[in-house]
Amino acid sequence: MPNLTHTPLPRRLLLALMLCAATSLPALAREGVDVGGNSAFSKLVPAESVERSATQQYAQLLQQAAAQNALGPKDNAQVRRLRAIAQRIIPFTGVWNPRARDWQWEVNLIGSRQVNAFCMPGGKIAFYTGILNQLKLSDDEVAMVMGHEVAHALREHARKRMGKSAVTQGAARLGGAVVASVLGIDPRLTDAAARGGANLLTLEFSREDESEADLVGMELAARAGYDPRAGVSLWQKMGAANKNAPPQWLSTHPSGKSRIKEIEANLPKVLPLYERARRG
């Protein structure tokens, strides 16, 4: 007969199991998509520096647009539409990035044939008339685009790219010491990245970043009461627009059936959020 006498777990093992259980509970309890934590590379660059640069570059862009009579006035129907959609999405951003609660959000429309939109760090959103007019986007589809771009800012993808750049530059200079600098956050790398003056308007994101932005954006839209299934029709329209020449917005974004497939695979995670938002 086997000995069923209870044998106490070693204290260190018990503590490890308790820690694992504690850290896994929030993930199990959370509704919506699962994209993991933010990249450690973003910690190499101060968030304040990135947001300050974004504010300056955004202001310059608006000044240039205004000088060309291409900045949509606040009473423009499309401007009102974009700002109304943003007002529904913004309340759900703080969960993804606590700093977003203090961002000075801005939403503007720029007259241009470019099929493009973006959200810079700090909540600086801009749409080009081309993406609205050429693709004839519904409100749900606009919310998917906006959610995607806002997700880039919330997940600090620009900050991550700048951090990676700092590591690359530091590696050439410091050789093997770069590993220690990543773990210890060498201030020289931080300073180099902060002084780099990255053009946040033209910064390209990785395929992983784009996939993450798709999913987080879809959840933001769903929580705001916009149908996340619009992500499928959006990318179908993008694909059709891509037949002749790739729109600027697509040139740095992965496309194709795999993207739609990933959105469809995650719909069960966000459709309940959408239905709940609709019921109010």
Model-identified regions with their sequence ranges:
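A Zn2+-metalloprotease active-site environment signal
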Residues: 2-280
